[in-house]
C-alpha cells in the first residue's frame, strides 16, 4: 500500500488533476475595526495587519462604508460573505432587501448571510409563520438572480434561527436557503454542534468558526482553544469536499489582534492535520 499511494499521486499529477482545494480562512470586517480601535491605528493599518497574519477574506455588511470595501480589495481580501440584517419580525422590508441585492450586484459578492432579526416579545405562531414566508420569498428572489443566500444558527431565543428546530421550520419552507454553520451557537441553544452538522451538512455554504470558553461560559475565545469541537467539525467539512470559507468569529475579544493570530494559527494547524 505504501508503494501504491505515491504511484497514485504521480498518476494524478500526470493526468492534470490537482489535489483537492482546502477551505480558506477569513475574518469579520467588524474585527478589523476592533483591531483599529484597540491598537489606536487606522482601518487600513489594521486591515494590513490582519492580512499579514494570513487571512484571505473578510465577511462584510451590505451597509459597509465603500471606502472600507476598497481598502479590503486593495489589500487582496477575498469576498467571503456579505451580511444583511433584515428585521422580518417587523413586517415587509423592501428597502433593505433592495439594498442587499444591490450590494451583491455592485461589489461582486456571491454569498449572502441573512440575519433575520428578532421576533417581538409576545409574537404568535401566526406572526412567526408570516415572517418565515417573507424570508422564503426573498430567498427565492436572491437565488433566482444567481446568488447564494443563507441563514445561520443565531444565539438569541427570539430568533427564528435560534436552534435546530427553528432552522428546520425555515428549511422545510424554503429549498432556496443555505446554511451558514456557526460552530459556537448551537451550544448556546442547547443543541449538539456535531449533530447539527450531520443534519444540515447538505445546506452548508459558509462557516463561522466560533469557540466558547465552556458550556457554562459563553464568552468567545480564539477558534480551536475552547470547548467547541472545532477540529472535528473542520475535519468533517474537509472530508465532505467543502472548500469554501472558514470565517473566524470572536466578538467581545479584548485583544483582537493577538486572538486573531492565535485563531489563524490554530485553524491552519487543523487544516494541515497537525
Write out the residue ranges for each language-model feature.
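A cross-domain feature marking catalytic cores of carbohydrate-active enzymes
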Residues: 27-31, 60-62, 81-86, 114-116, ...
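Active-site groove signature of glycoside hydrolases
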Residues: 104-124, 145-155, 247-248
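Conserved, mostly hydrophobic/aromatic
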Residues: 50, 58, 104, 149, ...
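Acidic-and-aromatic substrate-binding clefts and catalytic sites of carbohydrate-active enzymes
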Residues: 34-40, 57-69, 86-95, 120-123, ...
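Sec-dependent N-terminal signal peptides
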Residues: 4-13
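Structural preference for beta-strand elements that scaffold enzyme active sites
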Residues: 24-26, 57, 78-81, 110-113, ...
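Acidic/histidine-rich catalytic cores of soluble enzymes
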Residues: 144-227
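N-terminal pre-domain/capping segments
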Residues: 15-106, 110, 178, 265-274
Amino acid at each position: 500500500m505504501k508503494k501504491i499511494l505515491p504511484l497514485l499521486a504521480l498518476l494524478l499529477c500526470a493526468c492534470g488533476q490537482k489535489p483537492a482545494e482546502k477551505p480558506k480562512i477569513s475574518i469579520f470586517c467588524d474585527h478589523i475595526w476592533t483591531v483599529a480601535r484597540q491598537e489606536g491605528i487606522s482601518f487600513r493599518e489594521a486591515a494590513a495587519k490582519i492580512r499579514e497574519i494570513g487571512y484571505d477574506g473578510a465577511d462584510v455588511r451590505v451597509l459597509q462604508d465603500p471606502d472600507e470595501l476598497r481598502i479590503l480589495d486593495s489589500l487582496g481580501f477575498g469576498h467571503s460573505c456579505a451580511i444583511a440584517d433584515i428585521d422580518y419580525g417587523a413586517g415587509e422590508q423592501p428597502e433593505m432587501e433592495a439594498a442587499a441585492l444591490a450590494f451583491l450586484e455592485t461589489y461582486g459578492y456571491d454569498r449572502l448571510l441573512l440575519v433575520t432579526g428578532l421576533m417581538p416579545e409576545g409574537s404568535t405562531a401566526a406572526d412567526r409563520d408570516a415572517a418565515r414566508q417573507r424570508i422564503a420569498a426573498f430567498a427565492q428572489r436572491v437565488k433566482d438572480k444567481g446568488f447564494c443566500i443563507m441563514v445561520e444558527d443565531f444565539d438569541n431565543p427570539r430568533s427564528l434561527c435560534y436552534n435546530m428546530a427553528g432552522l428546520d421550520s425555515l428549511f422545510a419552507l424554503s429549498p432556496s436557503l443555505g446554511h451558514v454553520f456557526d460552530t459556537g451557537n448551537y451550544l448556546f441553544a442547547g443543541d449538539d454542534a456535531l449533530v447539527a452538522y450531520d443534519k444540515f451538512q447538505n445546506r452548508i455554504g459558509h462557516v463561522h468558526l466560533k469557540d466558547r470558553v465552556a458550556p457554562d461560559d459563553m464568552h468567545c475565545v480564539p477558534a480551536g482553544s475552547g470547548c467547541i469541537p472545532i477540529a472535528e467539525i473542520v475535519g468533517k467539512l474537509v472530508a465532505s469536499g467543502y472548500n469554501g470559507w472558514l470565517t473566524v468569529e470572536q466578538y467581545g475579544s479584548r485583544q483582537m489582534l493577538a486572538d486573531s493570530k492565535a485563531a489563524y494559527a490554530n485553524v491552519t494547524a487543523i487544516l494541515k492535520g497537525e
